[in-house]
Amino acid sequence: MPNDLYAIYNRYTSRTLFFKYCATATLTHRLTRRLSLFTLKKCLARPQGRLFSLVNSIYFGGETLEEVQSTATFLARSGIACVLDYAVEGENDETQFDKAMENTLRLIEMSQQTDSLPFVVIKPSSLGSVAVYARQSERLALDEASASAWSRIVTRFSRLFDYARSHGVHVMVDAEQTAIQPAVDRLVLDMMREFNRDSAVITLTLQFYLKDQLRFLDECYQRACQDNFLFGVKVVRGAYLEEEKRVNGGVRCFATKQETDRSYNAAVDYIALRLDRIAPFFATHNEESLALIMSSESLRAGRTWVGQLYGLGDHITYSLLQTGFRVCKYLPYGPLDKSLPYLLRRIEENAVASATFKKENKLLQKELLRRLVGGM
C-alpha cells in the first residue's frame, strides 16, 4: 500500500474528498446503504445542483472527448492508463446507433495517438436494437426489418474492429443483460477468428456472477485453440444483478457474494494456466482476487492488465503500479443527463461492505486529517 496519500488523492478538492468519504461510509454500511442509494438516485434524477457536480467530479471523466482526454492526461502522469467508455445508454434508433459508432471511431483515432489509452469500449446496445439482440439470442426467426437491423449491427461491429486493428488499438466489448448477451457472445467470438490472429484486438467481457461463466470460459479457450486465435477476456463480477433479479428472479446468478467471489477467483486460476491463448484484463476492487492475481508469476510475466473504476479503489490502483502489472482506470464520459443510468448502476454495483472499501474509507479519513492539520 503506498504511503503517499497525496499522490493517491491529489485530484480531489477537500470538499470533494469529504463527500467521497461520507458517500463511501454510508453506501457500504448495511444500515444506511439502501437509504443512501435512494437519496443519490433522487438527487441525480435532476442533473443540476451541488451534489450532482460532486458525484460527476468523482466518477466521470467529462462530457466531451476533449474533457475526458484532459482527465486521461492527468492520470497518465502517474503511469495510469485509461479505458474510455462512452456512457450514454437508452438510445434506440438507427441514427443514434450510427452516431455511437462514429464516436467510437474517433475514440480509436485518439487512442492510437495516446499511449495511455490502450483500449476503447463499445457497448453492444449502443450499436443496435435490444429487441433484435434478444431475438438473435433466442435464435428466433427475424422478419425483414429485424434481419436488416441485425445486418447493420454486424456491419458496425466489423467496421469498428477493422478500424481498431488498422490503428493498433484494442476494443473492449462491454457485457449486457443475459437476455441479449448470447447474441453478443456469438457475434464477437466469430469476429475474433478474423481479427485476433496476431494480437487480442477484441476483448469480450465475462460476468462471473453468472453460474455458467466458468463453463463458457472453457468453451472460449477451446475454440481459440481450435480456430487459432487469441481470446481477449475482461473478467468482471457483474453489473446487472438487481436487474437480473427483477427480470428472471436471478436464477442464472449465484445466490451469494461468496459464491460469486469463488467463481471469479476460479477464473483467475484457470486463465493463469492458459496464457498461450488467453489475453486477460481483470477488473476488480476485491482484495482477495487482487492478492491471487498478484501472486501469480505467469500473470505478472504475461503483462496482464488490471483495472478499477474511475473514482473507486484509488489506493488499489496506486498499489498495483508498484507490482509490474499494467494498470487502467475505467473512465466513463458523455452528456451527463444521458449517462445517469450508467452512473447509478456503477454506484449501486460497488456499494457493498467489503475489506476494500473499509480500507479506502480509513485512507480517506487519514488524508482528510492530514489536510486539516497541514492547512490544505
Swiss-Prot record:
Keywords: Antibiotic biosynthesis, Oxidoreductase. GO terms for biological process: antibiotic biosynthetic process; proline catabolic process to glutamate. GO terms for molecular function: FAD binding; proline dehydrogenase activity. Pfam families: Pro_dh. Pathway: Antibiotic biosynthesis; carbapenem biosynthesis. Belongs to the proline oxidase family. This is Carbapenem antibiotics biosynthesis protein CarD. It comes from Pectobacterium carotovorum subsp. carotovorum. The lineage of its organism: Bacteria, Pseudomonadati, Pseudomonadota, Gammaproteobacteria, Enterobacterales.
